[in-house]
Structure formats: structure tokens, C-alpha cells
Amino acid sequence: MVKTILYKDTARWTLEKGFDALTEAVAVTLGPKGRNIVLEKKFGAPQIVNDGVTIAKEIELEDPAENTGISLLRQAASKTNDVAGDGTTTAIVLAHAMLKEGLRNVTAGADPLTVKRGIDKATEFVIEKIQEHARPIKDSRDIEQVATISAGNDPEVGRIVAEAMERVGKEGVISLEEGRSTTTELEVTEGMRFDRGYVSPYFVTDPERMEAVLEEPHILITDRKITMVQDLVPILEQIARTGKPLLIIADDIEKEALATLVVNHLRGVLRVAAVKAPGFGAQRKAVLEDIAALTGGQVISEDTGLKLENVRLEMLGKARRAIVTKDDTTIVAEGNEEAVKARIEQIRRQIQEVESSYDKEKLQQRLAKLAGGVAVIKVGAATETELKDRKLRLEDAINATKAAVEEGIVPGGGTTIAHIAPQLEEWAKSQMKDEELTGTMIVARALYAPLRRIADNAGANGAVIVERVRELPFDEGYDAVANKFVNMFEAGIVDPAKVTRSALQNAASIGGMVLTTEGVVVEKPDKQAKAPAGVGPGPGEGFDY
């Protein structure tokens, strides 16, 4: 493939064009009065979204060099989403502001590496200040506020997420399901999540979210290594006749057996997902017994003399739903309350009997997983388009509340970093000089960008709002809904410190990397012969089969 090489300023300006295109599309969604974006889908109805990372994933330009800029900025959003689960739009707005300011200086002759060093030092300073000002989560009211703000100022979402967290605990599992009515409901059921993901990505059923979702699956639980596919054939044939999917939890699955399962899954013969058993040694056996109690199945173990080839359908566990990602597996079960209660009592007795603090801790972890259950939020909406948007908002809200529990909360609406900016300027002028000072000031000026954008989206003058906020005490800021200045904690406008920190870290990382870029190598697009004017697709043409 023929390549195009761009150098120095041309390379940086081309990347910036991609940055501009993506930022303009994503930044309009920022804040409580942010607008929506409509995404055209090749198959199915268009999707209306308000979620930064979802929009970023969909944008692709014709120019491959500009597209490279989009991919780089998308990384800042994706990384923020992976770490904190929210704050993707803020990360994009910050990275764009740093890049615009930085490119101006580099073009004027500043040394990119020294400027980047200044950006890195400034980022460390701001992160320290964010952690200093973070307040721990006190009660469910704090959780409700965080969830409401994260869901785009939707109080109903805030209430449901806070109730879910109250019922399953701060470490509990909250799962989303598509409901069958127009109202969003909360249900707490038996269930468990463990930290083992699918052994092959070919088991994925939802490629957009990279999840394997199995509805009403049978569950094969074994502490044995599956080496020969012949061992599985009898039970696979029985399951195929039921038409239900299968989740395999095993010690390990050898290549030959795994390949057969993948091929059957891809051909649609049998929907299946396989994960490795959680825990180690004796601990693993106990966790498998917990899963068996939860799902009403048996552990197929050598200790009990059971062999895989002799397994019958009634020995398998059952669940309402199983969701498997690359990192963990969530089982939503129901109808085995008595067995689960008996198992919980057994673990409680063991906790009282053991003396080792390590064993006690592991037993308590198992108890929490079994007793906590799973909060299932059934998302309701009038149309499928609204349902998808609501699901994304709920997902953001759940992630934001978990981030808030971890690192605390800070004043929201871009206020925290806007208040830290003058402190950064003061510190930089006393500690930095020359081009390092330039790098630090780039970050200081970029810190106002999210607040400015929130105000602009609310129909106010962003520059005026920024100047007013600079004069206010740290806890006070701009309420875009009411268009007035308030105490952010009292008004319930709060952000998780982890989200703000991650957005800044990833924005600075991408911004700094682009500033130090001296060349871009991209594939030259093929200039394909265009059809003569007026010639449209004939019968059977122009469709993807």
C-alpha cells in the first residue's frame, strides 16, 4: 500500500483538523443543557445519544491523516471511560484546548519536549489539588447527586442508582436490562460477579460492548480441565435440543476443545461462552460450590466421582441471565433462595470457627458476594431510540457513583479545575521558567475550557461566566440549569474526583504526545473510478449481503 508522509507543522496541523472535527461533534453534549447527536446506523434505526465516547467511536473522516487525529483523541476518551466510566467529553474538550494552545506556541518556535515537560508537571500539580479538595461520600444523597449529574441532570436516574447502591452495598453488582414497559424499575435478585472473563473473544454476542450475553443459560460447573471435546459431546447434544445457551465454568479449556466450542458458537449450532473458574486451590472449589448453590447445579468434580461424559441436564445450574466481559462474569439467578440461605449460614459458621485472618477475609468476601445479590435495573422507554439513550445515561451514572465511592467528590460543572487554574498559574510563575512555564500555562488556560463550554451550551457567555467563577470561593460555581452562581455542594452539582482526575491525565497525555509529533505516515487513499453521472445501482446492486 502506498503511504503519504507529512512532516513537522503540516503533520501537526492535519492532526489538529481531526481534533477540531471530533471536538465540535462531542463538545455540544457537555453539561446539563448539552444537545444530542444523531448517529446513523447501517442497520436499524438511527441512535440519538448524549455520550461522548459513543459519538467518538462513530466518527471517521475521508482524509486518513485527519482520521489519525480523531483516533488519538478517541484514545483519551476511551481510556477515561475504561478507568472512570464517565468524563469522556471533558477529556476531549481538555485535550483539544491543550493542543490548540500548544500548537500555537510550537509553531512560534517553542521546543515541544520542554513544553511537554511543563504540561506533565502542571498535570501532577492539578491532580494533587483535586485529591486535596475531594470529599468522601457520606450518604445515599451524595450518591443520588452524582448519578443525577452524570446522567445529564436526570433526577429519576439518580434516585434509582442511589436506591440500587443502598440495597446491594457500595461494592455490590448493578446490572442493566432492557425492560418491557415504559417505566424504569429496580429489582434485587440473587446473583454474583467474579473476576474471570471469557477465554476467547469469539464468544462475544454484543460486539459494540464486547460482551457475551446469555439469556436463561444452562451452567456447567467443573473443577476439571477440559482437554478432549469428546468429554463434552453428550451434554452439548442434550443442551442443543433444549435451544438454550450454555455457560461453561471450568479449571481450564484446552485448545482443541475451545476451538470446537467456538466453531459451534459461530455457526449458531449452540450459543456458548466459557470462562475459567475463579480463585485458586481449595478456595476455587469453595467458590464453585457457591456458584452451584446460587444456580441450583452440581460441581462436576473428581472428588465426587462425576465425569464430564456422564453429566446429565439436571446436574447443570440455571440462571436468568449471564453477562461475560473480558474481565468478569455476572450471573443473575433466581428461584434458589433456600439453597443460597443455607450456603450463607454455612459460610457464617466457618467465619466464626477459623482463626487465620487470611481465611477469614476470603470467607467474608465469599459471603458478601452471595449475600449481596445483584440489583437489576430494568430500563424502560417509549421507543427503542430512547431506550438506548437511557441505557447509556444509566451506565454513566453507575460508573460515576462507583468512581465517587473510590476517590470522593468535588464541585462539579467544570468548577473544580477552573478554581485550581489560578493556583497553578501562581505556582508556575514562582517555580517554572522559559518553555516549561509555557507548558504549564497551556494547561492553566485549558482548565477553563470545560466550564466555558458548559456555559456556552446553556446559552450563556462562556468567557463572562469563567471570569465570574474565578472570583468566587472554591465550593461555588455556575449552575447552568438555573443560570446562577451557587454553592455546588449545597446545590448537589458534584463530580467524582476520579472522573475529573482521569479526564485531565488522559487529555494531557494525548495533548503532549501530539505536540512532540514531527511526522505522520498514513496510507494513501485509492482513487477509485467513479460511476458516470446519472448511473445508479441496477437491480440487486448497491446492497451489502
UniProtKB/Swiss-Prot annotation:
Residues 526-545 are annotated as: Disordered. GO terms for biological process: protein refolding. Pfam families: Cpn60_TCP1 (PF00118). Its main location: cytoplasm. Gene3D superfamilies: GroEL (3.50.7.10), GroEL-like equatorial domain (1.10.560.10), TCP-1-like chaperonin intermediate domain (3.30.260.10). It is an enzyme of class 5 (isomerase). It is found in: Cytoplasm. One of its GO terms (molecular function) is unfolded protein binding. Keywords: ATP-binding, Chaperone, Cytoplasm, Isomerase, Nucleotide-binding, Plasmid. InterPro entries: Chaperonin_Cpn60_CS (IPR018370), Cpn60/GroEL (IPR001844), Cpn60/GroEL/TCP-1 (IPR002423), GroEL-like_apical_dom_sf (IPR027409), GROEL-like_equatorial_sf (IPR027413), TCP-1-like_intermed_sf (IPR027410). Signal peptide: none annotated. GO terms for cellular component: cytoplasm. Its EC number is 5.6.1.7. It catalyses: ATP + H2O + a folded polypeptide = ADP + phosphate + an unfolded polypeptide. It comes from the Bacteria. PROSITE patterns: CHAPERONINS_CPN60. Residues 535-545 have a biased composition (Gly residues). SUPFAM superfamilies: GroEL apical domain-like, GroEL equatorial domain-like. Belongs to the chaperonin (HSP60) family. Forms a cylinder of 14 subunits composed of two heptameric rings stacked back-to-back. Interacts with the co-chaperonin GroES. This is Chaperonin GroEL 3. The lineage of its organism: Bacteria, Bacillati, Cyanobacteriota, Cyanophyceae, Nostocales.
